[in-house]
Amino acid sequence: MGSRLLQFQSYGKWFMLLSLATAICLLHLPSYSCTYSRDLPICTPQVSFQLTNTTPTATLFLSTVKEVSMLLSYVAIDLGWNVNFPKPNDYDTSNLVNTFDPSNKYHVNLFGYCKWQPLSNKATWYCMDNPNGLDIISMIVRDLGAQLGVLSHTNTKILSDSLWILYRSIFDSFYKFVHDDDYRADKVASFLQSLQQGGPLPSVDQFKTVTLLLKCFEKLTNAIQVTELCSFALIIIAIALATVACVMDILAAREEKHSATSDKLPKALFFKQITLKLSYAVVTCSLFYQIGMAVYFLALFSIRYPYDYKVKVMTFNPDTGYWLSVLRFVMEFWFAVACYIGLSLSRRRPSKEVDDLDWKDEEQTPDSGETAICVSTRGSTRIQV
């Protein structure tokens, strides 16, 4: 009865451990949503944001970019005439690019985004993959390219990627231009001052600071993606090794019923040790992920609540995917604790069984030629003459 109870406890321990690891693995899946509109348009975003026109700066900014996007829309419609000759209503404002419309709401995830556009005459909801993940600027550029692709009857994915490549080329060239030569940066500042008709002269340091912050923001979003991928891969490997260790442990327990030793017990202990180290690695990756997300939200909060409220251009909120990642981090921590406790008990088990052996007569040993009786706590008696 006692051996069955111990066996049941061992099976229950493995069942709980594998169930916890499987739940952690399933909680990683929402991070890969918000990528496709067809078939299963599920989205559990990390963050949701909207552009706002409640401040003078935001109103001026949105009106400017809207005029530019309207011009691009007209060009895109004219370029698609060979596929479908444009109709007069195609030039209506409701059919043009609305990337910068304040009514739109963007749901951003690590590898894609979804867009809710209630004022559109076409699709009010669609999702697209975005390799740049949480980089909001890259996401807006890709969305602009996708809408231009629809207007010009071109492959939206190709045009979206092409526009992003153009943006990256311009940004990298400007970054190198500003940081390599202060004289050229001063000339750019003077040119911008002439456009502002005697406004304040932008300094070279301002150009350097803005471009450097954008560069750091891009690297931060890439680092968040890498930590998520590493954490997901490690937990999958940990589940596989924990399953192997569970099978080895069960086979070793069955062999011990018929013999004193089992060659599968050291193998099970080896796989348990690797699983424990992987659980530590999973927690470490998730910790860096949470730190990266905290820095990311601090950067967005600096935009949402700037020092000068008049320059507020967007509002954002952490969304369902982020809170699920926090829950996943807590579960990963307890998974590592459970692995540590299980390995500690496995290490104590062999030594305890040896210590429980009690020779009835210390003077009568197997070498003395007399009968020696060894009683084990496992309930079996061995007699050697």
From Swiss-Prot:
Protein's membrane topology: Multi-pass membrane protein
Coiled-coil ranges per UniProt: none
Residue spans crossing the bilayer: 14-34, 232-252, 281-301, 323-343
GO biological process: one example: sporulation resulting in formation of a cellular spore
Keyword Ribonucleoprotein: no
Protein name listed in UniProt: Spore membrane assembly protein 2
GO cellular component, one term: prospore membrane
Residues on Cytoplasmic side: 1-13, 253-280, 344-385
Organism of derivation: Eremothecium gossypii (strain ATCC 10895 / CBS 109.51 / FGSC 9923 / NRRL Y-1056) (Yeast)
UniProt-annotated location(s): Prospore membrane
